[in-house]
A protein has these predicted regions:
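Alpha-helical multipass membrane-protein architecture
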Residues: 1-320
Length: 320
């Protein structure tokens, strides 16, 4: 956008608002994918006392992010991930691009807001939250405010009054996690139901406007699962966790890690498509608990969580 304001023939092409929107979308998807799918997961082995595994895990989650991008391209506007469903539409970004393109009062107000943001941040004011609350839905912001007050003030006061041993506060702390896990399981069941539909049922539920058919989507997900199997095997080898397990348990871990990776995509993708939010932490927690019950060793569980945490958020952030 700034380049488009520079006089000259070379910079004229940047005046196209569609080009600006495409560039911004690419930058946004890449930024979120890098943060959620690459930088965040590599902290897990470090927190577990194995900083030497940072680079191997980074290699694995980077490959997983690339597969995520491939699958987004292949399944978007399919019966499961329809383009007509309410993905977050990025209205704020579009309005910003239009304001700068049209110049005038709206453009001036935008620069005033930018100046206020810089000044407020320099003074230590959380201007990013202020900006979000300004153009956010008033009902959603009110619900968030009430929830913050209840969690920060009322619940601690109540639990301190009724609990001496600290059991009640601990239980209440885990209630939101339980709610997210339940929501994640529902999304997984929804994905399974859509994938299990056959023949005439699919034709009744879909329209000719879909650019990706159910069969094509299934083939893409099958290819994605195969790629995730390969990445899981690579992770097991370069991180050394294969030495902690027997051959049989290693095979089970690889298959389970690939399933967790693609299931995380489906759960987070469906949640984001319908609500604009996704239970990435809950999804990773679900597969962590299942992995614990399956008896996987300590470090292999950490690699599993890092792998799972890389796929769902990347798929969702790049799609939205």
């Amino acid at each position: 956008v700034v380049l488009s304001m520079i006089p000259g023939k070379v910079f004229r092409r940047f005046k196209n608002v569609h080009a600006q929107n495409l560039v911004q979308t690419s930058i946004s998807g890449a930024s979120y994918a890098a943060a959620n799918a690459m930088i965040l997961p590599i902290g897990i082995p470090v927190l577990m006392g194995r900083p030497d595994l940072l680079i191997p895990v980074l290699i694995g989650v980077t490959l997983a992010t690339i597969v995520d991008g491939f699958l987004i391209y292949k399944v978007f506007d399919s019966p499961m991930f329809a383009a007509t469903n309410p993905f977050p539409s990025g209205i704020a970004t579009s309005e910003t691009i239009l304001a700068l393109a049209n110049r005038g009062k709206r453009s001036l107000l935008l620069f005033v807001g930018m100046g206020a943001g810089v000044a407020g941040k320099a003074l230590g004011i959380p201007m990013d939250l202020f900006g979000v609350s300004w153009f956010g839905n008033v009902v959603a912001m009110l619900a968030f405010a009430v929830g913050s007050i209840v969690k920060g003030s009322l619940i601690p006061a109540w639990t301190a009054a009724v609990s001496v041993d600290g059991v009640v506060p601990t239980m209440i702390t885990y209630l939101p996690h339980g709610a997210m896990i339940g929501a994640g399981l529902v999304s997984l069941v929804q994905a399974a139901l859509v994938l299990s539909k056959k023949g005439k049922k699919i034709q009744e539920d879909t329209t000719s406007e879909r650019t990706v058919s159910m069969n094509s989507m299934r083939k893409s997900l099958g290819l994605g699962f195969a790629l995730y199997l390969g990445i899981a095997l690579l992770l097991a080898l370069i991180t050394g966790i294969y030495s902690e397990m027997s051959v049989g348990k290693l095979v089970v871990w690889i298959v389970f890690a690939a399933f967790a990776a693609i299931a995380s995509e489906l759960v987070c993708g469906l949640s984001a498509m319908h609500s604009g939010w996704f239970p990435a932490m809950a999804t990773a927690l679900i597969f962590l608990m299942i992995g614990i019950m399956m008896g996987f060793p300590h470090m292999s569980l950490g690699i599993l969580v890092a792998y799972t945490a890389a796929t769902g958020p990347a798929f969702t952030d790049m799609a939205t």
